[in-house]
Structures are given as C-alpha cells and as structure tokens.
Amino acid sequence: MRFSLHLLPLLGGLHSLTEAKPLDQPSVTFLSPSEVSPGSAHNVIIEYGGSADGELTITYDSCDGAALVSSAKQRLGTTHVGDHPLAARHVDHDNRRPTKFVWLAPTDASELVGQSENLRVVKRIPRRSAKRSFAEVAGDDSMWFNGVAYLEQKEPDESFVAAAKSKSFGILGAGMSGLMSSLLLDSVGIHNWKILESSERLGGRFRTVYLNGTSPEEGQYHELGPMRFPVEITDSETNETFPFNDQRIVFQLADVLNELNAGNESVQVKFWEWIQSSPNAPVDSPFRRPDGTFPGKAEVATDPAYANPTVYHNTTAAAEAIAALDKFKGLDAERIRMYATNIFAAYTQAKEDGMFDYSEVSYLRDVIKTDLNTTDEVTPSHIYWPMWEYETVYFLATKWLTVKGGLSRLPAAFEPLMKGRIQYGAKVNGLHYNENKTVSVSWKPTGSEPFETPEEVESFDYVLNSVPLNLLKFWDLPPYSSLLKRAVDRTLFGNAVKVIVQFKTRFWEHLEKPIFGGCTRLTKPQLGQVCYPSWDLNATGPGTMLASYLSDYEATVACSMSEQEHLAYIKKALIRVHGDVVEENWTGNSARHCWEQDEHHAGAFTMQIFSQQDLYLPAFYQTQFNTVFIGEAATFTHTWTFSALESALRGTVQLLLDMGLVDEAKQITNTWMARFIEAALPPKPIYQTNNQINQTIEAIRNCQINNP
C-alpha cells in the first residue's frame, strides 16, 4: 500500500582529495531499489556517470530543501572510491568503484522516496520493536529476507559496501548442506566456489548401498543413512489431514534439480511411497506363535493371549510421573498441528515452555521430585536429550515418501552441476585467518601417508563449513569466541550402525501373515529397527531388508564385533523371529556401516544435551573469521534432511548479508524459505514449481553456460 506522497531523495556526496567543487553533471545515478519497506534492509544500486574519486557518502533526506550531506536525515554510509588510496579495499570492483550498497531503511520512512525515479514505500509484515539477534530472527519467524536485526549489529560503514560476487568461496563437505549451499550461491550469480570433500562421493550421510553389484532399478538396495520423509499427518479424531510443511523443501529441491537436469533421466529424482508401519511386522513380546515365531503388530493389539502390560514397582508413582511428563510436553492435537505446519513457531514455543531446560530425567527428579527407581523405569532412553518433541511428531506421520531407487539419487543429481568445482579426497585439518582477511584451508589427500605427505593449502575469501563438529576437535582453528569454541568442543554426536541383508526371495511377503513394507523395533534379540522394503512389492527374485538398525550404546557394542560376527548374530536373531525360512533364503550378501567409525563423520547425528541447543545456536549464527557454520548440528532440528537443507539456507543468507548482498539474500528466502511454513496458508502441491523456482533454475543454467 502507499503512504504519504512527499518525495525524499537518496543523495550521493563525493569528497575529493583536493578542494571540493560542485559537479556540473551528476557523477552518480541511482538505479534501485524501486520500492522499499520501512525498517527493512535493501540494496542501493548506483551507476557512475563520470569521474568519481574520493570519499563517497550516500544519504537519505527530504527533497524540500538543499541536498546537503551534513544535514541529511539518514547517512547510509561512507567509503572511498576510484583513485583514492583508501579505495584499495575495493580492488574487486571495476575501477575500484563499488555499485551496490546496503541501506537499512528507517522505520518512519512513510513517504515516497527517490531521486531520478520515485521509490514506492510498501507496507511490510509487522515486527517486534525490540532489536533482535539474527538467531532470533531466523529462529522463530523465518524473516531472514529482512536481515535488519543482523545488519544492525555491524558498524554502519562496515556493512555499507556490498562485496563483489567475484569473491572466492570454500565449501567444506559435500553432504546435503554443502551441496545445497553451492546451489544457492549459483542461483544468485555467485559461481566462484569450490567444495572440498574428504571422501570420493557426494551426499555425506546419504548412503544407499546396492547389493551384489545391482543397479537402482533392480531394487536390491537399502539405506545405511536416512531412509524417508514424513509428508502428512491425519488427525484420528477429526479425520483432518495436514502436511509437514518443513519437509516440502526436500521436494522443492527435487523439482529444481529435475528441471536443471531435464533430458538426463539418469539423475532425475522421483519419489514413491514409503510404508512405515505394517500390521504383520513382528513386535517385541515374550510370547510366541504356535510355530515359535514372533507375533505381529495386529495380533498383539487384538489377541488377549499376547497381552503383556508393563509392570512397575510402584504403579501409582509411575502413572503420576508419565502424566507429569505428558502435561509438561503438552502434545495435544493443536500442538501437534503446529509442529507439523510451522516448525519455527514450534521451536519458539518449545523454548518459551522450557523444553530445552530439562531432559525427562532431570524434569522428574528436579521438578516433580519423582523417586529414582520410578524415574529410571519410565524414562529408559531420555537421560540427556531435551524435550524438543519434533521427532515424536514426525513419527506420527500417516504418509511417508522416499526416493525411488534410493536416497543417494538425490545428492547424485548435483553431480552435473559441479562443473569441476569439487576436490574429492581432500581431508581438511585446519583453518587459518590471514591478515588480508582471507581464510586458508589446510588439507591432505585422504588415505595418504600421514607423516611425510605435505599439506595442501587453498585460500578463500569466505568459508561455509559443514564438516561434523566432532571432527573439528582435532583441527587447527582461528581463535573463535568462547561460546563457539565450546559449541565445537562439547556438542555430542550419537553412534549408529545399520546392516542390510539380501535374501534369495522376498520370503516375508509369502509368510502365512505376509509383511509388505514397514519398520518395527526388536530389542530381544537386539536388532533395533528392522525395515522391510516398501518398493517392488510382490516382485519375484531376491529381496533386501534393513536387518538391523541400532543407535547409541547398543551400536557401540555391535560395532565392537567383527562384521561377520555381527552378521552371524543377526542371522540367528532373524531365525528366532521368522523361523527356518531365513536359513533357507540366506545368501550372505550384506553391508554394514558403523557411523562412529566413519573417518568422514565420526558419528551418525547430533545429540545436544538439554540446555546446550539454545545456548550454542546463536554462536553458529554469527560469522567469525569469514567462516559460517552449516550442517545439521548448526540448526534447531537435527538428524533429518530438512535440518541440513535449512542450515544451508540460513548459512548462505547469513553470508550474503555479511557481504551486503541484501537483494540476493531476499531472493533466496523468498524462493526457498518458505512462506509455506506459516500455518495460515493453504497446503500447496508437493511438486509445485513456481516463478521463483524458475528464476533460480535460470540463474543456475547461466552458471552452467559460463562454466563449461
């Protein structure tokens, strides 16, 4: 909407090294912005029409009087351009004359502004009047496009001149956050980036294994990393279905990659249904069927003969403890909907409710004063974790999707976009901040002789670091702030081990009570999660299942066994579960991955203990020594693909704001950062491609043309 109709100009004041003289012709013409929002950040783009050497000051003032820099209403900033000695900082710009500047528009700019062209002032979404940190802006309302709170922390002239897009960018790690960052940089015309990846593959923890030399199309695979995406949830009482809005970014990414790779079927990303729960999947029970096999989920739920209620030493105390936890978490229908439709609002609510201040154990012991034995009985696996219940809500999903042919096909779709801008086998061991404000990255070839092999050193203007924090404990690092040092040193990572096994047939689909897809959890024997494939149902020939997925301490014990010893245990356990049909179909073809022993990760996922997350997160949201931290550890949810992608969005926007590239930061947030997160918006189709996505695709295509 329009406000009042007075005119206010943007003024460029140029002070030369010698006597100041009036200019016969304007040396500067203002090209943009065409409209502004009061109290928000904008880029001011100018064009030099003549000689411009000296101190340049840009101001904002009324058109009613003389255009005097000294009496201007607002000074945007001052820098030096052209032949001035202090203009050497702008060597990356043509003739040392930058053309893009940062303007934090005043909150009372309720008028039209402009000089050659009028600037239309538009109403923006109301914001809190109190100054907020970038972490707070990003954390609760996703309004990163504004950027004001972050830029206000900087000295005015420090953030005044926008950096040139020709700067160099190092991206450490080719997991999903690193890959996403490269895509985002390309989309805003920044192409001078390079990924350093310690392994020989893309995808990080995305790790699909195709057994026995098969192809994705043959279906003989399973996931040793992430497996699926929650899509929607149906309220069992109202029958209302609503989406997991945060997960839509995964499908939006697939849309963009598919369009960029149009015509190359081998890297198209397609989705099909994942079956998370199956009625006949075996469940933990002390009881057995007449044939000695484990009963299924539906049998245990409906047959009284399989009833096995939990027994507590003090039933009343246990019930009170469980009720206290449920009340504190408050996961009613309304809260579940908020978690699904607006994860940012859910995070804010969780902070306000104190969910990060306690684990289940500490809450019961310190607040409710529950006795130790009862506490231990009702909280078997929640000693350290905060009560941030997003994963609980994820697993209430009634519809799931996975990538056809395996999740590794998603990072594989980035391969055609690399264009030689990735160094595989580069194991980083340190960062050094130089006097010229560049960052040197030291690395050695992965697997090289450790004592005599010299280090390689590459320097970048900026670094996006997605390497798991626990690996950084052994790096040489710049003198980061105390908070960031502690975040690196003390953030914990959980262990996990997955084992997939190929069988001669899909025998589980031919049992008396057939199993079609689905996951279950078995602790006696110690298999953890077992997942039957959701694809190629009723197919002939061999089949592959996730035979064991253990995490935390159980994974540590399992990984202490040799792979063959562990496989023998799994075979024996599956025979107990399904009977001799396992022996009859056993091939021995298998794969195991112990994530804690993986030299590129040293852990499976972040496990920040209670009180750590809200303490450490702001440290990641501050750029230190031209380095921005991204990855699932550096965001407010963990372990899921969304976490990695969201961190890349935040980190790239943070970097662009550091560089003063406000327009580019807006472009990314308006394209990706989810107006669909707001619960008030109606659901969008999962595979929507809008004009903003098309603009992103076109920008990246231009990069491909310029980088053959």
Which role does the model predict for each range below?
Residues F160-A321:
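N-terminal glycine-rich phosphate/pyrophosphate-binding loop and immediately adjacent elements
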Residues L17-H42, L151-E158:
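Short, compositionally biased P/S/T/A/G/V-rich stretches that sit at domain boundaries
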Residues E320-V439, P445-P450, S459, S466, ...:
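Active-site/ligand-binding neighborhood in enzyme catalytic cores
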Residues M1-P22:
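Fungal secretory targeting signals
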Residues E35-G50, Y60-L68, A72-L76, L86-A88, ...:
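Conserved flavin/dinucleotide-binding core of flavoenzymes
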